[in-house]
């Protein structure tokens, strides 16, 4: 009887926390050591959106050496509390939520016996099996909800982990990205995950077009976020090559500041890709396209109005307001489902408790 009463109290407390939004939403992150990473910014954007809506959110890091993100994201996220696995006594409760990125699949086993809402976060589907034990499913460890960034990833996850409910939340293309009020500079923004590709493109461009050696290439990799946004809007065109990308924020950021994109279509073709840039499947054609565009730009030729409109239309589903509302709705659905489950469990225990009390009364009457 005492055990039932104790369980009822725990469930009632959990229900109060959920209804008052005082339960904790944990986001597990890795330490970038002050190196800008879009995947970590994505997590911080989720966390900050929920925090600003009144949720109790905490960043969960490995230990006290965690360097944070202020060095490359600024002070915007400073009000997000950071707790550590090794140094803080983190007690995850039944009403809490934990969000685990796909590259942290090696921690799932340690979370298997924890009763809470468990969410996998998949930004790169190629990393799903990198640390997940062979033959294991997320649901083996109690993870039955997934957040990902594209329809392609959602389809892949549904095919493999069909017991999971998959939600799409694209990255926020921040309001820091605004068109420049001045004429673009003769500068080409280039973003290639593989730095050897950047070097190859730049070297080949200068060899093929020696008369354009005065044109500058600006490597956009590993820039602090504010510097990145300010530098991008100064450029006349951007070049993007990233075959491993699942979503690809750089082209959308370029479109948002109003500069056209030249890029290789990655093997995982993004949802947003259409006639909104100068695209090719052949990486060897990138330099030729850049040379043609730069020559036309120097002669005063602009991209046509149809492409400009396509760029604007592409950005509509990725506005800050739309994405933030999507985040809030999805996490609210997690909360509602948890409330429903706890209410059912509480009702069942109360019925059992009442039944025990009733049987006790009957025993007294008989005796």
PLM ranges: what are they?
Residues 1-94, 229, 262-269, 276-283, ...:
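N-terminal pre-catalytic "stem/leader" segment of glycosyltransferase-like enzymes
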Residues 90-93, 224-235, 256:
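Short acidic alpha-helix that forms the nucleotide-activated donor recognition element
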Residues 284-288, 298-358:
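A charged, aromatic-enriched C-terminal amphipathic alpha-helix characteristic of glycosyltransferases
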């Amino acid at each position: 009887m005492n055990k039932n009463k104790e369980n009822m109290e725990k469930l009632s407390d959990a229900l109060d926390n959920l209804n008052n939004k005082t339960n904790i939403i944990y986001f597990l992150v890795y330490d970038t050591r002050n190196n800008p990473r879009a995947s970590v910014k994505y997590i911080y954007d989720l966390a900050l959106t929920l925090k600003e809506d009144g949720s109790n959110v905490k960043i969960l890091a490995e230990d006290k050496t965690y360097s944070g993100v202020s060095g490359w994201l600024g002070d915007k996220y400073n009000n997000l509390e950071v707790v550590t696995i090794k140094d803080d006594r983190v007690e995850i409760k039944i009403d809490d939520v934990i969000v685990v990125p796909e590259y942290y699949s090696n921690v799932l086993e340690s979370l298997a016996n924890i009763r809470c809402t468990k969410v996998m976060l998949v930004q790169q589907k190629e990393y799903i099996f990198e640390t997940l034990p062979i033959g294991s499913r997320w649901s083996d460890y109690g993870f039955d909800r997934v957040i990902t960034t594209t329809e392609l990833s959602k389809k892949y996850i549904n095919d493999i982990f069909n017991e999971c409910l998959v939600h799409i939340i694209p990255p926020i293309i921040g309001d820091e990205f605004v068109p420049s009020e001045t004429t673009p500079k003769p500068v080409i923004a280039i973003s290639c995950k593989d730095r050897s590709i950047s070097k190859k493109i730049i070297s080949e461009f200068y060899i093929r077009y020696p008369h354009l050696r005065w044109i500058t290439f600006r490597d956009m990799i590993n820039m602090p976020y504010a510097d990145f946004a300010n530098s991008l809007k100064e450029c006349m065109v951007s070049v993007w090559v990233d075959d491993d990308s699942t979503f690809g924020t750089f082209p959308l950021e370029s479109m948002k500041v109003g500069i056209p994109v030249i890029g290789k279509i990655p093997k995982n073709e993004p949802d947003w890709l259409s006639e909104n840039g100068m695209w090719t499947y052949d990486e060897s054609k990138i330099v030729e396209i850049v040379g043609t565009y730069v020559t036309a730009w120097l002669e005063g030729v602009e991209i046509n109005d149809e492409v400009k409109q396509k760029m604007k239309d592409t950005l509509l589903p990725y506005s800050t307001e739309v994405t933030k509302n999507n985040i809030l709705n999805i996490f609210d659905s997690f909360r509602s489902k948890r409330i429903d489950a706890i209410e059912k469990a509480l009702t069942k225990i109360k019925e059992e408790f009442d039944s025990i009390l009733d049987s006790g009364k009957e025993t007294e009457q008989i005796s």
